[in-house]
Amino acid sequence: MALLPILEFPDPRLRTKAVRVGVAEVVSSSFQTLLDDMFETMYAAPGIGLAATQVNVHQRFMVVDVSEEKNAPMVFINPEIVTREGDQVFQEGCLSVPGIHADVTRALSIVVRFLDRHGDEQQLTAEGLLAVCIQHEMDHLDGKLFIDYLSPLKRDMVRRKLEKQRRRAS
């Protein structure tokens, strides 16, 4: 297994729309290794979700584990939200936008259809943190970041803060 480099805002590759993954590819050993590498990268970061787009792989899949013990890994391949209900405001952060947190309104409950890591079709009802995480990671697959939900003024403040962090780091 290997740690993968995570793209950071404002890298334009984060804006790339991901393409669907073929079922034959899902079961390949190289794809399974990539999933394992993504989990290792997510846990090391540390994070609770990681979309393929964030590691410069522009295919529609993501890994998630919102458990406290980090023992409930979930893979979502070609995810689609079937239904959304209610609203919740959650303070979100992102491995691609380090050090920034902001309130984002998302659906309280979702039903998502997807392929699991074995290529089998699944359907899951998610609420709370899991629902937020799935919606956040699915946004990445569409080239969207959580900061896109902010006002232009707040987004500009985020950009300046990140530039300042990078200058300090170099």
Curated annotation (Swiss-Prot):
The residues listed in the UniProt record as binding Fe cation, with positions renumbered to this chain, are 94, 136, 140
Q: What class of enzyme is it?
A: hydrolase
Write down the InterPro entries for this protein, in alphabetical order: Peptide_deformylase, Peptide_deformylase_sf
Q: Which GO terms describe its biological process?
A: co-translational protein modification; translation
Name any cofactors this protein relies on.
Fe(2+)
Q: Which residues form the active site?
A: 137
Task: Cite the Pfam families for this sequence.
Answer: Pep_deformylase
Q: Alphabetically list the UniProt keywords.
A: Hydrolase, Iron, Metal-binding, Protein biosynthesis
Please give the catalytic activity noted in the UniProt record.
N-terminal N-formyl-L-methionyl-[peptide] + H2O = N-terminal L-methionyl-[peptide] + formate
Q: How is the cofactor bound?
A: Binds 1 Fe(2+) ion.
Molecular function per GO: metal ion binding; peptide deformylase activity
Under Enzyme Commission nomenclature, its number is: 3.5.1.88
Q: Which family does it belong to?
A: Belongs to the polypeptide deformylase family.
Entry function? Removes the formyl group from the N-terminal Met of newly synthesized proteins. Requires at least a dipeptide for an efficient rate of reaction. N-terminal L-methionine is a prerequisite for activity but the enzyme has broad specificity at other positions.
This protein is called Peptide deformylase
The top of its lineage is: Bacteria, Pseudomonadati, Pseudomonadota, Gammaproteobacteria, Lysobacterales
